Amino acid sequence: MFIFCTNRYNLHKFAAGTLNNSNYQILIEVPEENSLNDWLAVNTVEFYNRLNLFYGALRSNCTNESCPIMKGGPNIEYYWKRKKKTIPPDYIENVMVLIEKILDNPKVFPPDESVKFPKNFKRVTKEIFTKLYRIFAHIYVCHFQDIENIGAVSHLNTTYKHFYFFSRKFKLIKKREYEPLKFLNIKFEIQEEKKEKERQKQLQENNSQNKNN
């Protein structure tokens, strides 16, 4: 995907490492001396890889019989191109194949800094994130029990929480698309607000101690 030892390769490794860190508000910020497009690119690749692994673990539980509708909630159904009804296994396979082709296209996702990003790069990124979000929604709504059965709830929550805050920060997904998981999103927002208050409190205490010393 990214050429070894290039800045983009190293940035991707950094992004992959941050997905297990809980300080999301800081981690989603663009690192110094890197462009927004670089940051969007490496995180898009990493979120795709992570979600692909989750779905791979669930594939045997998402079948034509057990999962006949590509749902993101009780009244939310996702269609493939031109409002074509598609069963979840086919829909998700179509999405993953399409995204993989985009990620492998060096004109869209340049492997190193010698090639510039296309002018429509953020729009392409938005389309990818929207499609990935719909798969997250389907997994949470229709396969959460399966996730519990394989002991991967905390891993899914960690990945999705990072994905949610990242997509919200850079406005990659339209507000209405968040509807299926809005209660989970609110829960995560409250958690992060609490963490941030605790962090600020700790900083104040540390500053106060330093002054006294």
Each model region followed by its residue ranges:
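Charged/polar, solvent-exposed surface patches and flexible loops
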Residues: 49, 53, 93, 97, ...
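Eukaryote-biased recognition of C-terminal alpha-helical segments
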Residues: 152-213
